[in-house]
Regions:
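A short, surface-exposed interaction/processing loop segment used at functional sites
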Residues: 83-112
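Negatively charged, low-complexity tracts enriched in Asp/Glu with abundant Ser/Thr
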Residues: 2-55
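An almost-null, non-specific background feature
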Residues: 20, 24-31, 35, 73, ...
Length: 121
């Protein structure tokens, strides 16, 4: 787990920091917290990480796709009990889970793993 602490002014900047945190967590996991060298498949995956990340703008959400799976959804504008920038776990490929946000890319200070957003504690 990596804690993303940066506050951002734009959703695009926030998504960039979130995915950088996820990539850093992948490197941490692949190198056993830095105890071994990054090699083979893991080295290849980190090299392709940024090019494998796609941002898809929707009506209410920005969908962040890593390779072929949805990494998370980002709320574009305030609605219901969600704020602009809230990170939502994917319920499926086309919809987020609306139970609770996993953090906010604009406010920072949220945990992230290479597998996706974590619950706030």
């Amino acid at each position: 787990m990596i804690k993303v602490s940066q506050k951002c002014k734009t959703l695009e900047e926030g998504i960039k920091f979130m995915m950088a945190g996820a990539k850093a967590d992948y490197v941490r996991m692949s190198t056993n917290n830095g105890l071994k060298e990054l090699t083979g498949y893991s080295l290849e995956q980190t090299g392709k990480w940024d090019s494998n990340t796609r941002i898809i703008n929707g009506k209410k959400y920005i969908k962040v796709v890593q390779e072929n799976g949805v990494f998370c959804f980002i709320v574009k504008e305030d609605f219901k009990h969600f704020k602009k920038g809230d990170i939502l776990k994917a319920a499926g490929y086309n919809a987020p889970a609306l139970n609770s946000p996993r953090g906010n890319v604009l406010n920072g200070n949220y945990p992230i793993q290479w597998t996706g957003p974590l619950y706030l504690k």
